[in-house]
Amino acid sequence: MLEVVSILGFSSFQDMGRNGFRSLGLSRSGAADYYAMAEGAALLDQSPNSTALELIGNGGTFNVLEDCMVALTGATMLASADQKPLAWNASHYLYKGNMLNLTTQQNGRYSYLHLRGGFKAPKVFNSCSAQPVAGIGQYTRPKDILAQLENKQDPIAVSYTHLTLPTICSV
């Protein structure tokens, strides 16, 4: 469980999005970088559709409220826990009382903070992806508590051969 101390840009919960609701005027939403989502899921041995925090801008600071495992993927940021550098595109065990700091995107636009077990977020139309402009979910704010799903089952084995990523552009 994490507490948002500060956010330097925009951040919201995202998963692989919602399909089948365009006829109702609702876009797919979901993570902007499917590969970063799949990478985070692989690092934590969980479903690629697990909810992660998508960070757009310059990251933020998070107080670790209980021991947890996180993964950092997507656009590289400078990352540290209690001022000790953390590798990007890797998983890390954080301890209660640590201060996780993510700053300065080095490349790209979308960074992801994954929590083992996934973040707890409301599911709307089969997805936990926020789409604030449509009134679904909201951007994260200081003092928000980012909790793990209550269902703390053992990690599941995922077959990535069946993971279908959408085509971003065709040639």
Q: What annotation goes with each model-predicted range?
A:
Residues H162-V171:
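Single conserved hydrophobic/aromatic residue that forms the stacking wall/gate
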